[in-house]
């Protein structure tokens, strides 16, 4: 998995915050911003309950690293990977309901991609950022995730590709909000579930 992204609200663009993050055999990317209504990023919230040693294990210093560390905590509690992601989003949404939690996480056996946007419409702050880069017309696509089934020469299912915004993608299916795709890295089979 790989991910090109802008820095989250009011966070520096530094190497430690580049994706993917990797810890405990998992790779993680996050296409979102975990901030309150005033644009204050979760990293400035010293009272948010996160295991500091787990956070440090991600190698990052951003909201995405906090999100990943919350997922890792749920895995440590014994949750399956897909449910750990769902639980982490539920927990984070209690404090940051309008944030975007779109992400992908990959283990040796699975790829999970989640579309979980806190807003139906792209926020004005995101539109401004896109405008700064001359891409304002693409801002509406900011939180959209898509998947496409791959077929082999015989027409049999051979896997799935998941992608997010930024270019025209004919022939792809939209991953609905609060929906995840769970893909086997072993045989390419997949299923959808809601969180």
Regions found by a protein language model. Name each.
Residues 2-195:
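N-terminal segments that mediate ammonia production and transfer
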